[in-house]
Amino acid sequence: FALIFFAITGVIFLFFMKKDISRELPPFFLPNTGNMGIPICLFAYGSLGMGVAAAISSLVVLLHFTVNIFLASKKFDIKVILKSPSTYAVIIAVSFLYFDLEMPKFVLNTVMLLGYTMIVLILMSLGISLTQMKVFSIKNSLISSVGRVIFGPIIGFILIKIFNLSGYAAGVLLIQSSMPSAILTYLIAHMYSPKEIVDNISSMIVVSTLMSLITIPIVLFIALKYFP
């Protein structure tokens, strides 16, 4: 539901900014729940928070290789979905949950160790990726970024109240809702969209990430205070 409301917000912003709604929509409803969201949720709520954050991130990654590619290329390609490892990872995870299967302890421990290692790697990849991006339009980037890092947590908070969530689940949803635009939206746009669109998305990612350095600590404080 949160991603749907993020998308609606993006459509409204892009409509009034007279932008390409299809190709420039992904950065609005696909936040950086992996590179930034998972480590922050781990810091805030420990392994339980990281588990919920990883589940949200898995859904976002799946949407990257389905909806994001469809919007960027304006065509549906089943081959891309079948080639994506995230598709099979989500299927396996859902199967374990649905059939209430218990993962062998040695496998679980191995996956957990790899998961903690990946947190360091994804933070490094975030920094490297940001150095390769540039800001082409400050005004439009600021307006778009407000839609992501300001309206995002507001929508998350509203959904928490609507669904009466509490504890770490509510906190993780609020934190993940406040994340800046995902870098993967830039990479996919670079493959499928015109240069002008790629430049706009690049600008939004950089500016929203910089803005999040101010907004995330505030959201984190609220999450830990009201959803311990």
Residue ranges of predicted features:
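Alpha-helical transmembrane segments of multi-pass small-molecule/ion transporters
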Residues: 1-228
